[in-house]
Swiss-Prot record:
The keyword Phosphoprotein does not apply. It comes from the Bacteria. This is Large ribosomal subunit protein uL16. GO terms for molecular function: rRNA binding; structural constituent of ribosome; tRNA binding. Belongs to the universal ribosomal protein uL16 family. The keyword rRNA-binding applies. Pfam families: Ribosomal_L16. Residues 1-22 are annotated as: Disordered. Residues 1-14 have a biased composition (Basic residues). Keywords: Ribonucleoprotein, Ribosomal protein, RNA-binding, rRNA-binding, tRNA-binding.
Amino acid sequence: MLTPKRVKHRKQHRPSLAGKANKGNTITYGDYGLQALEPAWITNRQIEAARIAINRYVKRGGKLWIKIFPDRPLTVKPAETRMGKGKGSPEHWVAVVKPGRVMFELSGVSEEVAREAMRLAAHKLPVKCKFLKREEMGGEVSES
């Protein structure tokens, strides 16, 4: 699972989802990408599930880049606990994804293989996604 090795503060405020992605919104490494169309918190387990889905489909071919990292802790208080008595314990780590953020990049495979692998990964994520090609940086919407 993706988690930070060290953090300065164990508990943080909840991350904001306002606005659009102003960095990480272009394909930089691979030939194909998966771009978020909605804001969301994506957990380390969801990122791992998408990574496994892509790797299973492309098998030994291609190189995958994961361009998001879950660096924000989400805390949860136990069930049936009264208000107060401090902040809850960290439950899991999330990556803040804003619209336009390219989350995964893939190269070394054909367009058909990349499109299907990204479609499978999009089903594992809680956001609507778009498949991108480096040449056009446009794409089509994939419901998830």
